[in-house]
Swiss-Prot record:
<keyword id="KW-0349">Heme</keyword>
<comment type="similarity">
    <text>Belongs to the cytochrome P450 family.</text>
</comment>
<dbReference type="InterPro" id="IPR002401">
    <property type="entry name" value="Cyt_P450_E_grp-I"/>
</dbReference>
<keyword id="KW-0256">Endoplasmic reticulum</keyword>
<dbReference type="InterPro" id="IPR050476">
    <property type="entry name" value="Insect_CytP450_Detox"/>
</dbReference>
<dbReference type="InterPro" id="IPR017972">
    <property type="entry name" value="Cyt_P450_CS"/>
</dbReference>
<dbReference type="GO" id="GO:0005789">
    <property type="term" value="C:endoplasmic reticulum membrane"/>
</dbReference>
<keyword id="KW-0408">Iron</keyword>
<dbReference type="GO" id="GO:0020037">
    <property type="term" value="F:heme binding"/>
</dbReference>
<dbReference type="GO" id="GO:0016705">
    <property type="term" value="F:oxidoreductase activity, acting on paired donors, with incorporation or reduction of molecular oxygen"/>
</dbReference>
<dbReference type="GO" id="GO:0005506">
    <property type="term" value="F:iron ion binding"/>
</dbReference>
<dbReference type="GO" id="GO:0004497">
    <property type="term" value="F:monooxygenase activity"/>
</dbReference>
<keyword id="KW-0492">Microsome</keyword>
<keyword id="KW-0503">Monooxygenase</keyword>
<dbReference type="Pfam" id="PF00067">
    <property type="entry name" value="p450"/>
</dbReference>
<keyword id="KW-0479">Metal-binding</keyword>
<keyword id="KW-0560">Oxidoreductase</keyword>
Length: 533
């Protein structure tokens, strides 16, 4: 039996350990209060990340809750675990940080280091300072209007394959769908769109960036598609690994926990290196990303500033093979997931708003009729209502729920309360929450493409619409993502009406199981073949 003295010692020891743990878990949580900055109440160790860790809220809901709790302030403080983060709510302040005073906020935060995860740490999003500027300049020529026009034919062919595949499935009830999530509900073809659209975007990236033909609609077991699903899976254990890097990058590096699977990493290494070697040996020149990376490696790529080639030859960069492969992985990730997610939400919004769908189909029909049934680069960019629908879809469901910046030199905020950010301080811009703020968008949950009409779009306050970020650090591939999304939608809507079915999630609820903008149970819709086509 334990003596009274032993019991007292154990009680003291446990109390002491709890006290030390509490002090460690809250040691910096007075960071904002000491600076007279409004901030949120915190929990030891978790800071303000508890709802995400415990899966009580989706990432979108979590960011919106933080934004709303700081209502009335131009900025305020929160904690990512034990790390202080300044949340910006004021559009003018966002403009200063992302554009006007960009030199003070040059970098993104990069919790996953190059040493811990080369394919993640070395990509354009995570590169810093001069290395980021050099890589951004290198990759920019891949996304000019002329390059988009050259790739349009390749992307449109993938869109055509998508439309024809669905027509075959609709007309042939016995057609094998090779693992596609396709069912029937009465006379309707019911489809899980996330699976369908990721097959499409996979093929788009494969052909336009790597020069590879996959046809994932008929052959979903191809390795390119399987690795794409692996790289873009932010659920399960990978979600907690990422949160672990936010909590303590050093600990995660010590534990050697990888964010990307070794299989996916080696696949992309081999793909990029092998493609480069083959092209170099056989003298193959193709206007795609691989060719640009080859030029960058050899130091023969013309640098580009502000979207125009300046004619100067860039000095040969000191990049290794992993530097180049990391950009290919980023391009694949952005094109694979961003466009497919946008297409899912856009299709859902059209199915649940048939008046908008009908008007968009009228515009598509008229454009195709004027161009002898052909979809051209010029035609798709002349469809104003299509652009309005896409813009409003991106407002409601932006691909990035938030973006961030890291201060690189002292910066005094020009607003009260006065505060000077120091190098290393983190800044958070809650895109999703701003897009859903009734102050900027009346009735923000309503799908209303008219917000972006020629008559109304000037009413949108600058720096409150940020679907692809803002300033020099915005998404480099946004024009490509928009183009591949519009092409798929046109090929679909010229053949089918989108219908709500029993499996369609109404209302949409963003999943709490990961960082991806997706829904539990999938994006199920019905496809009804148009009788007038």
């Amino acid at each position: 039996m334990m003596s009274l003295e032993s019991l007292w010692l154990w009680t003291f020891a446990i109390s002491f350990i709890v006290l030390i743990a509490y002090l460690i878990g809250t040691w910096n949580h007075d960071f904002f209060s000491k600076r007279n900055i409004p901030s949120l109440k915190t929990v030891p160790f978790l800071g303000n990340m508890g709802p995400l860790v415990l899966r009580k809220a989706s990432f979108a809901e979590h960011s919106q809750n933080i934004y709303n709790r700081l209502k009335g302030y131009k900025y305020g403080g929160m904690f990512e675990f034990m790390n202080p983060v300044l949340v910006l709510r004021d559009p003018e302040l966002i403009k200063m940080v992302t554009v006007k005073d960009f030199e003070y906020f040059l970098d993104h935060r990069a919790p996953i280091s190059e040493e811990a995860e080369p394919m993640f740490g070395k990509n354009l999003f995570n590169l810093r300072g001069h290395r980021w500027k050099e890589m951004r300049s290198t990759l920019s020529p891949a996304f000019t209007s002329s390059k988009m026009k050259n790739m349009f034919v390749l992307v449109s062919e993938c869109g055509k394959q998508l439309g024809e595949f669905l027509m075959e499935c609709s007309r042939d009830k016995n057609k094998k769908t090779e693992g596609c999530k396709i069912e029937r509900e009465g006379d309707l073809l019911t489809v899980e769109l996330k699976d369908l659209y990721t097959r499409y975007t996979n093929d788009v990236i494969a052909t336009s960036a790597f020069g590879i033909g996959c046809d994932s609609l008929k052959n979903p077991k191809n390795e390119f598609f399987q690795m794409g699903k692996d790289v873009t899976n932010f659920g399960g254990i990978r979600q907690f690994i990422f949160l672990g890097y936010l909590f303590s990058p050093r600990l995660m590096k010590y534990l050697n926990l990888k964010f990307l699977s070794s299989k996916a990493t080696e696949f992309f290494r081999f793909l990029v290196h092998n493609t480069m070697d083959t092209r170099k040996t056989k003298g193959i020149i193709r206007p795609d990303m691989i060719h640009l990376l080859m030029q960058a490696k050899e130091g023969t790529l013309k640098s580009e500033e502000n979207g125009e080639t300046n004619g100067k030859i860039a000095s040969k960069p000191k990049w290794d093979d992993d530097d180049l492969t990391a950009q290919a992985v980023l391009f694949f990730f952005a094109g694979f997931d961003t466009a497919s997610t946008l297409l899912c939400f856009m299709s859902h919004l059209l199915a649940t708003n048939p008046d908008v769908q009908n008007r968009l189909q009228d515009e598509i029909d008229q454009s195709l009729e004027e161009n002898d049934g052909k979809l051209t680069y010029e035609a798709i960019h002349s469809m104003k209502y299509l652009d309005m629908v896409v813009s409003e879809s991106l407002r409601l469901y932006p691909p990035a729920i938030f973006t961030d910046r890291k201060c690189v030199k002292n910066y005094r905020l020009p607003m009260e309360p006065s505060y000077t950010l120091e190098p290393g301080d983190a800044v958070w811009i809650p895109i999703y929450a701003i897009h859903h703020d009734p102050k900027y968008y009346p009735n923000p949950e309503k799908f209303d493409p008219e917000r972006f009409s020629d008559e109304n779009k000037d009413n949108i306050k600058p720096f409150t619409y940020l679907p692809f970020g803002s300033g020099p650090r915005n998404c480099i591939g946004n024009r490509f993502a928009l183009m591949e999304s519009k092409i798929a939608l046109v090929h679909l809507l010229c053949r089918f009406n989108l219908k709500v079915v029993s499996k369609t999630p109404i209302p949409i609820k963003i999943t709490k199981k990961g960082f991806n903008m997706t829904v539990d149970g999938g994006f199920w819709l019905g496809l009804e073949e148009r009788t007038n086509q």
